[in-house]
């Protein structure tokens, strides 16, 4: 059933299938796209490679969808209506990131005016979502490539200039 659920989502999402969906921690799911190669996108976020600890819960609803545009890897995740989104690193503006577009690339910005302050000294390919009922989830896009993080009210998008990458979704009570 889970495999069919993921196939439906990837077929709808675009041209990159999800190769592997694995429970790697307590309510932590790893999504690996077809074509992922650790030598092209080594992890700078993980201390060690995760290992499967069990089956993905049947009621899992936060599903990464992968696409590729002109050879550049992308991932997106639909989020429940009314979700508040936070993250992306050091950027100017409000902490609430809904409706924001953040460039993720670490360089010395020099002035807050460059790129509208959308990238200062640290970028984090991480989003924290808080649902209207107060429950929360997190999404880690495990890529070091130059990227853009778009946090719409119904979807999180992560568009890179590089190779396919893994995503991790943490959804705990």
What are these regions, as identified by a protein language model?
Residues 1-8:
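Bacterial N-terminal signal peptides
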Residues 9-13:
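Signal peptide processing junction and immediate N-terminal pro/mature segment
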Residues 14-173:
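Catalytic and substrate-binding clefts that recognize carbohydrates or anionic sugar/phosphate headgroups
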